[in-house]
Amino acid sequence: MRHGHPRLLPGLLMLLLLPLGAAAQKTSGCARWCPPKSTCVNATTCRCSPGFSSLSGEIFSSPLESCDDIDECGPPPLVSCGRLADCQNTEGSYHCMCSPGYALASGATTFMNESENTCRDVDECQLKPRVCKSRGICTNTKGSYTCKCPPGFELNLGDLNLCTDVNECTSGQNPCHNSTHCLNNIGGYECRCRPGWKPVPGSPNGPKSTVCEDVDECSSGKHTCHYSTVCINTVGSYKCRCRRGWKPKPRFQDRQLNTTCEVPAEMSFPTWTPPPGIKSQRLSNFFERVQELHRDFKPALAQETIQDLIQEVDELLEIPGDLEALPHSEQHCVATNLLVGLEGVLRNVSQAMPNGPWTFNASAGTDLSLEVQEEGYRNVTLSQNLAKMMLKWDVVHKSGDSGPSVVGLLSTPGMGKLLAEAPLVLEPEKQAVLHGAPKGLLQGVSSVLLSDVISVFMSNKVTQKLSSPVTFIFSHHSATHEPKLKVFCVFWEHSQDECGHWSTRGCTVVDSGDTSTTCQCTHLSSFAVLMAHYDVQEEDLVLPVITYVGLGLSLLCLLLAALTFLLCKAIQNTSTSLHLQLLICLFLAHLLFLMAIDRTEIKVLCSIIAGALHYLYLASFTWMLLEGLHLFLTARNLMVVNYSSVSMLMKKLMYPVGYGVPTLIVAISAASRSHLYGTRTRCWLNPEERFIWSFLGPVCTIFSVNLGFFLMTLWILKSKLSSLNSDVSTLQNTRMLTFKAIAQLFILGCTWCLGILQVGPAAHVMAYLFTIINSLQGVFIFLVYCLLSQQVREEYGKWFKGIRKTRAESEKYTLSSRAMSDVNKPMMVN
């Protein structure tokens, strides 16, 4: 191995020997062909410089030789640099260098041999803190380093020291919900709600878990729609649409965010004409003024038109003039015309009003509260001095309608003058409530108007059966709570055939105090609070006694008759089978009536009892019909009663008809109007909506058919009697059939007709007749079918004889036993 300073020595010697060489050439000669990197030895040989060699060695004599660099680093290596170092050949020499990532402890860059090797790892991360660019994280390794990128970054393939941002939004590496959109940022991303959306309750706006929902700008008031338009929410946005009946202004388009609309000139004041046949100068003057308002109406002046109309109505009712001289019936017609006309005009003209609540007042007390609003999900309350109305907005806004809706409450205190002595029509159920006792008889009703008359109108014209009831709170004159006085919530009902009357249909009193009454109604019209005075006949205490005693006897007789037909085998045939089914149905119906007719505490139970009574009584009447049919067929086939087709026909028909027909009627009634089973005072059919005819209709039909059977039976028997021979048995059978036909008509329906005839002056008498005869129906049946039947009497005789014989044998056995006992006593003593 060579050292740094010794390498300089050959060079210096060469410089010193040059003059000598030149002299020697001159003297001894030197080869002129020596190649580069060599020196002349003599005239025939050359020597390669240190670090170079030729093929022949260090000294050569051929002019074709050249001196080439000796590669000390090999292969094979001529020197050893040691571990973590690399040999670097140089022209004429070499040096050792630490491998990349390593350096000498001295700080030098080269060394000559392994003994000088002090290479150790270089920490590039400390040496060059910014070796990893753009947020890269440097990690030192043996002899090198690596750059790692934080989340949201990745290494640049062109420069492994450079970290570049990952765009998660375009790469599909984000889990954002579809209700959000991805926003890329340096090193990450956000899930932000889309425009027009908002985070759902409990969800933040930005993190990966963000979930959004549409913002209803319309209901939240976060829209910029002009008052002439209606806000319509869309997914992520909204539109502004012209109100119903309006049109966009010039240079504007409908359904845009900046839409502005105007009222079209064709929105008209509806035609309103006076009632026909009414002669009144005061009314004529009023309608002349109405025609002026109609002629001058412009949608832009809707507010002024409504105010003028309210004032005109107010003045008419304050000073009615010659209207007061009209008969009450004609005054009622005028009131109906005013109420209906006002409702129509105000409904139409209000469509031109801007959104918002409005109030109109007149000097004499006529007031109008109006609300024009978009569709909402809230309660609406309109108030005046003496009345308040509360309803749900979905009642006002008809499904499918566009634009805002209108609801108005009009109070007309002066309308009571025209409605004086107006008739009051009470529902049957309200009549029962009036007199408080279901057995009392209502004699007469007179009414007094306590409150102002209010009218309700809305843009939705379908108001006959509202989805939810409307609540009214009336403040009125003090009501006297005495017997024979009752407060009612009423509305003004009119038709084409009559001018109108007060009615309670669909309205109920929720609460009533001395000066305030709360009502609920399922329809809209003109409403008021009436106090009705009535006379009630005192309840007759004798009728319940007759009912319970008579039904008790009937139950006993029905039970005896049923046991007779069930246990007596000798008399059983088709006729007795019909009798037995009739007796069972009547027995169960009377028993249920006695035990449960007043069980009204639990409404569901009361409805079930009413349905059971409905079924049992209808089944009784159906079996009565089959009795009449069988009697008619028997009379027609008098001579072959037991061998004709009558028996077979009745056996096939009686059970399906007897129990199937009433089942069908009750099933249809319960499916259509189940809520009408049971009243407040009785577990029977509610007379509302003519539901009672689901019982009376079949009863009347059966009675009519039985009457026909009776007449035809009499006609057949009459012809039989005229053609009979002297056969005594046939004559007796025919007479018995004639008697049964007469009794059948009386039992099978005539008594029930008396119940329908309980009206007018004879109602009290009819009530007694119906109660007595109907409650003793079981007694009549036992008398006709058992006691007056020779076969049954004979069977009863056999039973009694058997009972006496059994009793006699029992007594004989007892006496014999005693005699034997007396004989044995002395023997036992002995």
UniProtKB/Swiss-Prot annotation:
Keyword set, alphabetical order: Autocatalytic cleavage, Calcium, Cell adhesion, Cell membrane, Cell projection, Disulfide bond, EGF-like domain, Glycoprotein, Inflammatory response, Membrane, Repeat, Signal, Transmembrane, Transmembrane helix
GO molecular function: calcium ion binding; chondroitin sulfate binding; G protein-coupled receptor activity
PTM remark: Autoproteolytically cleaved into 2 subunits, an extracellular alpha subunit and a seven-transmembrane beta subunit.
Ranges per topology, Cytoplasmic: 562-576, 625-651, 712-744, 789-830
UniProt cross-references to InterPro entries, sorted A to Z: EGF-like_Ca-bd_dom, EGF-like_dom, EGF-type_Asp/Asn_hydroxyl_site, EGF_Ca-bd_CS, GAIN_B, GAIN_dom_sf, GPCR_2-like_7TM, GPCR_2_ADGRE2_ADGRE5
SMART domains to which the protein is assigned, alphabetical: EGF, EGF_CA, GPS
Disulphide linkage map: C30-C40, C34-C46, C48-C67, C73-C87, C81-C96, C125-C138, C132-C147, C169-C182, C176-C191, C218-C231, C225-C240, C489-C519, C507-C521
Site entry (Cleavage), positions: L524, S525
Compartment list: Cell membrane; Cell projection, Ruffle membrane
One annotated GO biological process: inflammatory response
Domain of life assignment: Eukaryota
Recorded domain comment: The GPS region of the GAIN-B domain is necessary, but not sufficient for receptor cleavage, which require the entire extracellular stalk.
This protein's name: Adhesion G protein-coupled receptor E2
Species whose genome carries this gene: Canis lupus familiaris (Dog)
Lineage of the species this protein comes from: Eukaryota, Metazoa, Chordata, Craniata, Vertebrata
